[in-house]
Amino acid sequence: AFTGYLAVSYRKEALPRLRLIFLDTERAVKPGETLVDLCGEMQDIDVGEELFNIGIHANPEPAAPLLRLSYGSFITPPTVADYRLSDGALIIRKQAEVQGGYDPSRYEQKRLWATASDGERIPISLIARKGTHGEDPYRPTPAPLLLYGYGSYEDSRDPGFSVSRLSYLDRGMALAIAHVRGGGEMGRRWYDDGKLEKKPNTFTDFIACADYLIAEGYTTPAQMVANGGSAG
């Protein structure tokens, strides 16, 4: 809680989000009312990317005109920024340095959705160097692809930058992350539906994601490899 607003972390469509809820501080709280009754305008902080991870950073002054936050994505290195409350401007304070002349504009990330055998929608994160799947986003050219999945302990595989990933992206290989049940990307239910007697959902979800990527033309059976391990 801050002076005049709340900052709330939540998840939407399998991604972390940060929402500001501004409070009506011009009137006194009436008997029987709670903080919820003072809630007014709501505003989600957007960093301008389809997929990103965002969270609140250290903010020792509740009345400060800036909100310190951190964010990143599959193509954006970890970044610390200030969100200016007066106009919504995002001011970058520090970003992790990537050696070798890294240019994020050469890469792309997108969200896809596969359909599981029971009808559940399974989110997929696809990361590639631009041009890997051709120039037509509606008719992708098949390319070598690594499909990764985990799906255990309610652990969410949220967008995050990796230098080592660039090596195979630059050589024309794509990465797809299957956010299968057993993880926490879609909330507690997502975890519950992928453990104990429902653990097979983790594996059938993964297969559904593989089938989807092939059917949509992102890769072929001969070009796809898969990776997973541990309890996933």
Roles of regions detected by a PLM:
Residues 232:
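Catalytic nucleophile loop
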Residues 30-47, 90-97:
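Beta-propeller fold detector
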Residues 14-22, 75-82:
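Structural motif
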Residues 3-11, 63-72:
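Short beta-strand elements that form the blades of beta-propeller/WD-repeat-like
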Residues 12, 61-63, 74-75, 118-121:
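Short flexible coil/turn linkers enriched for glycine and charged/polar residues
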Residues 23-26, 85-86:
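Short loop/turn segments that connect beta-strands within beta-propeller blades
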Residues 4, 16-18, 40, 65, ...:
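Repetitive beta-architecture junctions, highlighting loop-to-beta-strand starts
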Residues 48-50, 57, 83-229:
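Cap/lid segment of the alpha/beta-hydrolase catalytic domain
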